[in-house]
Amino acid sequence: MAIHLLGIRHHGPGSCRNVLEYLQELQPDLILLEGPAEAETLLPCVLNEQMEPPVALLAYQPDQPQNAVFYPFAEFSPEWQTIVYALRNEVPLRFFDLPLVHSMAQNQKPHNTTEEQQEEIIPTVYRDPFDYLAEAAGYADGESWWETTIEHRKDSADVFQAVKEAVTALREELPEHTSPRDQLREAWMRKMIRTAQKENFERIAVVCGAWHVPALENMPKVKEDNELLKGLPKIKIECTWIPWTYDRLAFRSGYGAGIESPGWYHYLWHHPQDDGTLWISQAASLFRKKNMDISVAHVIETVRLAQVTAALR
């Protein structure tokens, strides 16, 4: 029995291709995917011809519908392609994150936290932990570092091992970046992995956010996780699919796992081998629709300049 941990970015064409290549080679007999267990019954809808991403899973509390969460998916989201792979190949797939009946109840009142302790919680300025890797490698921020080293990577060999080692180092140096909520989620994920191990699956693929991988590889004692999960609050929730947009998928919308340019990632997913010519041609077409004089010569020179600048970088 083997557990294969695939640490991903939630929306990225490179991560997406890496996951698909790994799954096709591994041929798993079970896939555990980061997501809410309550939504598993909605997964067959993914193959419906009218289901066109971007879409989102909406989970809400029926008696308080303002208490809701969204799980967006784009065509280039590793989770989306993992679901498609599982359905088309008839591989069992389970969402193994902390159930929403607990996590949404926890959002209303922190688990194992008194009213006095809640008042003492002071908001802090969040810094992407990958910013530290970016700084060491000479990049402006974690976003640009991840895009260059992972999303634009042509060779997927050992990429998941490299990501795991990088995140392990970050978590060791930055323990404060793992929140109590993440600790609860990871305890539940480990519980679901242990359950799957007892069912005699031979090749289990675990697809989750890269930050969680070290916590799922180095498991504490069962007793420790059970103690952490003891007495979780619970509410009733319902789930459904809703349409989504690339604007809402962008980081600027306030979405925590958002990306800078969803349209660019959509392009990379569909045209991974393009040298920039098609992208610039599409941009030129948009300019022409605005009655701007853009010639073929402009396109050629722009592509040439972009390629030379990229080579210098």
Give the role of each language-model region.
Residues 1-313:
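Compositional signal for N-terminal targeting/processing segments
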